[in-house]
Design a protein with these regions (language model features):
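Short beta-strand His + acidic residue motifs that chelate non-heme Fe in jelly-roll/DSBH
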Residues: 101, 109-114
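Non-catalytic, conserved peripheral segments adjacent to functional cores
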Residues: 1-99, 117, 121-175
Length: 175
Protein backbone atom coordinates (compact mmCIF):
# COMPACT_ATOMS: atom_id res chain seq x y z
CA UNK A 1 0.00 0.00 0.00
CA UNK A 2 1.25 3.48 -0.82
CA UNK A 3 1.33 6.45 1.54
CA UNK A 4 -1.89 7.16 3.37
CA UNK A 5 -4.00 10.27 2.82
CA UNK A 6 -5.52 12.39 5.57
CA UNK A 7 -8.98 11.05 6.44
CA UNK A 8 -8.68 7.88 4.35
CA UNK A 9 -9.06 4.77 6.48
CA UNK A 10 -8.16 1.20 5.58
CA UNK A 11 -9.90 -1.41 7.75
CA UNK A 12 -8.41 -4.91 7.90
CA UNK A 13 -11.40 -7.25 7.99
CA UNK A 14 -11.40 -10.47 9.97
CA UNK A 15 -12.26 -13.74 8.23
CA UNK A 16 -13.98 -16.42 10.32
CA UNK A 17 -13.51 -19.83 8.68
CA UNK A 18 -14.48 -23.38 9.52
CA UNK A 19 -15.43 -26.57 7.67
CA UNK A 20 -18.61 -24.92 6.32
CA UNK A 21 -16.84 -21.98 4.67
CA UNK A 22 -16.19 -18.46 5.87
CA UNK A 23 -17.80 -15.28 7.15
CA UNK A 24 -16.55 -11.68 6.87
CA UNK A 25 -18.17 -8.67 8.49
CA UNK A 26 -17.66 -5.91 5.90
CA UNK A 27 -19.04 -2.86 7.63
CA UNK A 28 -19.75 -1.25 10.96
CA UNK A 29 -20.60 2.42 11.23
CA UNK A 30 -18.27 2.67 14.25
CA UNK A 31 -15.28 1.83 12.03
CA UNK A 32 -15.68 5.05 10.06
CA UNK A 33 -14.23 8.42 11.06
CA UNK A 34 -17.56 10.19 10.49
CA UNK A 35 -20.95 10.64 12.13
CA UNK A 36 -22.74 10.52 8.75
CA UNK A 37 -24.46 7.14 8.42
CA UNK A 38 -24.44 5.04 5.27
CA UNK A 39 -27.65 5.64 3.28
CA UNK A 40 -27.12 3.77 0.01
CA UNK A 41 -25.35 0.54 -0.94
CA UNK A 42 -24.25 -0.39 -4.45
CA UNK A 43 -22.50 -3.20 -6.31
CA UNK A 44 -20.27 -2.66 -9.35
CA UNK A 45 -19.13 -5.55 -11.56
CA UNK A 46 -16.11 -5.14 -13.83
CA UNK A 47 -14.39 -7.45 -16.30
CA UNK A 48 -10.58 -7.76 -16.28
CA UNK A 49 -8.80 -4.63 -17.53
CA UNK A 50 -11.65 -2.19 -16.79
CA UNK A 51 -10.61 1.12 -15.28
CA UNK A 52 -13.26 3.22 -13.55
CA UNK A 53 -12.07 6.70 -12.60
CA UNK A 54 -10.91 9.08 -11.63
CA UNK A 55 -14.11 10.18 -9.89
CA UNK A 56 -14.77 12.49 -6.97
CA UNK A 57 -17.57 14.02 -4.92
CA UNK A 58 -17.83 17.30 -3.05
CA UNK A 59 -20.33 16.06 -0.46
CA UNK A 60 -20.41 12.25 -0.43
CA UNK A 61 -18.08 9.75 1.23
CA UNK A 62 -17.59 6.19 -0.03
CA UNK A 63 -16.76 2.94 1.77
CA UNK A 64 -15.44 0.23 -0.58
CA UNK A 65 -14.85 -3.50 -0.17
CA UNK A 66 -14.08 -6.31 -2.61
CA UNK A 67 -16.85 -8.90 -2.83
CA UNK A 68 -14.93 -11.03 -5.36
CA UNK A 69 -11.80 -10.63 -7.43
CA UNK A 70 -9.16 -7.94 -7.09
CA UNK A 71 -8.36 -4.42 -8.26
CA UNK A 72 -5.57 -1.85 -8.18
CA UNK A 73 -6.99 1.25 -6.43
CA UNK A 74 -5.71 4.82 -6.78
CA UNK A 75 -6.72 7.80 -4.64
CA UNK A 76 -5.83 11.50 -4.96
CA UNK A 77 -6.47 14.16 -2.31
CA UNK A 78 -8.13 17.17 -3.98
CA UNK A 79 -9.06 18.95 -0.76
CA UNK A 80 -7.76 22.50 -0.50
CA UNK A 81 -5.97 22.93 2.82
CA UNK A 82 -5.63 19.21 3.52
CA UNK A 83 -2.26 18.15 4.99
CA UNK A 84 -2.04 15.68 2.07
CA UNK A 85 -3.39 18.02 -0.64
CA UNK A 86 -2.53 16.68 -4.14
CA UNK A 87 -0.88 13.56 -2.67
CA UNK A 88 -1.81 10.13 -4.05
CA UNK A 89 -2.17 6.68 -2.57
CA UNK A 90 -2.41 3.28 -4.24
CA UNK A 91 -3.35 -0.11 -2.87
CA UNK A 92 -4.78 -3.48 -3.84
CA UNK A 93 -8.34 -4.29 -2.86
CA UNK A 94 -9.02 -8.03 -3.04
CA UNK A 95 -11.67 -10.42 -1.77
CA UNK A 96 -9.00 -12.90 -0.63
CA UNK A 97 -7.36 -10.17 1.52
CA UNK A 98 -10.52 -8.50 2.91
CA UNK A 99 -10.25 -4.81 3.69
CA UNK A 100 -12.64 -1.91 3.82
CA UNK A 101 -11.60 1.45 2.38
CA UNK A 102 -13.15 4.70 3.64
CA UNK A 103 -12.81 7.53 1.09
CA UNK A 104 -13.82 10.99 2.35
CA UNK A 105 -15.45 13.59 0.12
CA UNK A 106 -12.85 15.53 -1.84
CA UNK A 107 -10.64 12.48 -2.41
CA UNK A 108 -10.69 11.23 -6.01
CA UNK A 109 -10.86 7.50 -6.57
CA UNK A 110 -10.43 5.01 -9.35
CA UNK A 111 -9.71 1.32 -9.81
CA UNK A 112 -8.38 -1.07 -12.42
CA UNK A 113 -9.83 -4.58 -12.25
CA UNK A 114 -7.16 -7.29 -12.21
CA UNK A 115 -9.78 -10.02 -12.68
CA UNK A 116 -13.54 -10.32 -12.70
CA UNK A 117 -14.10 -7.81 -9.90
CA UNK A 118 -17.18 -7.13 -7.80
CA UNK A 119 -16.96 -3.98 -5.68
CA UNK A 120 -19.44 -3.35 -2.89
CA UNK A 121 -19.70 0.22 -1.74
CA UNK A 122 -21.70 2.35 0.66
CA UNK A 123 -22.36 6.10 0.55
CA UNK A 124 -23.68 8.62 3.04
CA UNK A 125 -25.94 10.24 0.41
CA UNK A 126 -28.39 9.02 -2.16
CA UNK A 127 -27.15 9.21 -5.74
CA UNK A 128 -27.03 12.84 -6.88
CA UNK A 129 -25.69 13.51 -10.36
CA UNK A 130 -24.81 17.07 -9.38
CA UNK A 131 -22.12 15.63 -7.06
CA UNK A 132 -20.47 13.37 -9.67
CA UNK A 133 -17.20 14.64 -11.15
CA UNK A 134 -14.31 13.04 -12.98
CA UNK A 135 -10.97 13.69 -14.60
CA UNK A 136 -8.55 11.75 -16.81
CA UNK A 137 -7.31 8.59 -15.11
CA UNK A 138 -3.80 9.16 -16.47
CA UNK A 139 -3.53 12.89 -15.65
CA UNK A 140 0.23 13.47 -15.57
CA UNK A 141 0.03 16.01 -12.73
CA UNK A 142 -0.69 13.15 -10.30
CA UNK A 143 1.94 10.67 -11.42
CA UNK A 144 -0.11 7.57 -10.59
CA UNK A 145 1.73 4.47 -11.83
CA UNK A 146 -1.19 2.46 -13.23
CA UNK A 147 -0.37 -1.18 -14.11
CA UNK A 148 -1.60 -0.64 -17.70
CA UNK A 149 -1.42 2.02 -20.38
CA UNK A 150 -4.46 0.74 -22.29
CA UNK A 151 -7.43 0.07 -19.98
CA UNK A 152 -11.04 -0.55 -20.96
CA UNK A 153 -12.88 2.74 -20.29
CA UNK A 154 -16.48 3.91 -20.37
CA UNK A 155 -17.32 6.71 -22.81
CA UNK A 156 -17.69 9.02 -19.80
CA UNK A 157 -14.25 8.22 -18.40
CA UNK A 158 -12.63 8.40 -21.85
CA UNK A 159 -14.03 11.95 -22.24
CA UNK A 160 -13.02 13.16 -18.77
CA UNK A 161 -11.04 16.43 -18.77
CA UNK A 162 -7.74 17.09 -17.02
CA UNK A 163 -7.77 17.32 -13.24
CA UNK A 164 -7.18 21.08 -13.44
CA UNK A 165 -10.20 21.53 -15.72
CA UNK A 166 -12.41 19.27 -13.57
CA UNK A 167 -11.53 21.30 -10.49
CA UNK A 168 -12.42 24.52 -12.32
CA UNK A 169 -15.87 23.09 -13.14
CA UNK A 170 -16.48 21.57 -9.71
CA UNK A 171 -16.53 24.03 -6.87
CA UNK A 172 -13.36 22.97 -5.04
CA UNK A 173 -13.70 21.09 -1.81
CA UNK A 174 -12.57 23.05 1.24
CA UNK A 175 -11.94 21.47 4.62
Amino acid sequence: MGATLDGVKVVDLEVHSDVRGSFVEYFRQSWLPTDHAALQGNVSRSTPGVLRGMHFHRRQWDYWFAVSGAAFVALADLRSGSPTERATMTMRLAADEPRGLFIPSGVAHGFLSESEFVLGYLNDRYFDGSDEFGFAWNDSSLGIDWPTADPILSDRDRANPSMAEALRVAVPYHR
